[in-house]
């Protein structure tokens, strides 16, 4: 018998949940009595919209897939839409269920669905605000698929359409980011989850939601900031100039 468990979003662990076992969840909400550790998804959604707008996008589109279980990832949409509404930025949202898009790579029907819905928006068939010129994808994997679909339509990224993903993933062979993205530190999430679990096992109180910092990561699918806006603000990661040390 184990003394504690850390469960990730997709874990099927309901049968192990009881008052005698210390349990910490990553991203998924089970109940207010079970601590949930995650990057700050609400702020991440706002940050994605803000970065697109600051780089010149004037009409935004959110594309995401959601799971049937309650999880913190849903807050990305709330943050994105909240920023747009507060700043009167035209936007539209596309949400696919996990049944519609079980995998953005291996499912031909899912890929076809993403492409057809995206094309309808880019052809102004599903939005009254005109063609979007800034897209926030709920994950980096989804952003890669969207970039490929846009290029098949003859649209350039980022010249015609800017694109921001979420997670901050990098290609294994080059170490370069998939796309411009909202980066969350998975190492910090893991360490914080272990710390929360140890505190629970020692009888200490732990917050029900632990939101960790996130930052914008330039990956080449967004335009540079305007000269008048080249300054560091919360959530903006600027390129490191030659000879500059950020440590």
Give the ranges of each region predicted by the language model.
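Alpha-helical recognition/docking segments in bacterial nutrient-uptake
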Residues: 1-50, 123, 129-130, 247
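Glycine/Thr-rich phosphate-binding loops of Rossmann-like dinucleotide-binding domains
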Residues: 14-16, 33, 70-71, 145, ...
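Short acidic capping loops at alpha-helix termini that bridge into adjacent secondary structure
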Residues: 59, 91-94, 156-163
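Flexible loop/turn connectors
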Residues: 111, 115, 119-244
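Short acidic/polar active-site loop segments enriched in Thr and Asp
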Residues: 3, 57-60, 133
């Amino acid at each position: 018998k184990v003394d504690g468990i850390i469960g990730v979003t997709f874990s099927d662990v309901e049968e192990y949940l009881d008052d005698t076992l210390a349990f910490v969840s990553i991203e998924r909400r089970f109940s207010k009595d079970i601590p949930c550790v995650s990057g700050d998804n609400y702020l991440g959604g706002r940050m994605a919209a803000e970065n697109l707008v600051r780089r010149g996008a004037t009409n935004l589109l959110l594309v995401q897939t959601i799971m049937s279980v309650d999880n913190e990832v849903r807050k990305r949409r709330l943050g994105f839409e909240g920023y747009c509404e507060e700043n009167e930025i035209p936007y539209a949202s596309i949400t696919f269920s996990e049944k519609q898009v079980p995998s953005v790579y291996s499912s031909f029907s899912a890929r076809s669905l993403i492409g057809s819905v995206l094309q309808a928006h880019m052809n102004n068939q599903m939005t009254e605000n005109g063609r979007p010129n800034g897209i926030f994808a709920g994950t980096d994997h989804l952003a890669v698929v969207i970039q490929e679909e846009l290029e098949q339509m003859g649209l350039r990224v980022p010249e015609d359409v800017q694109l921001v993903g979420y997670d901050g993933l990098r290609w294994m062979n080059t170490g370069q980011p998939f796309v411009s993205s909202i980066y969350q530190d998975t190492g910090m999430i893991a360490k914080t989850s272990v710390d929360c679990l140890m505190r629970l096992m020692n009888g200490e109180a732990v917050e029900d939601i632990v939101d960790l910092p996130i930052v914008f990561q330039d990956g080449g699918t967004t335009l540079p900031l305007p000269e008048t806006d080249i300054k560091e603000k919360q959530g903006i990661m600027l390129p490191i100039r030659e000879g500059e040390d950020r440590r």
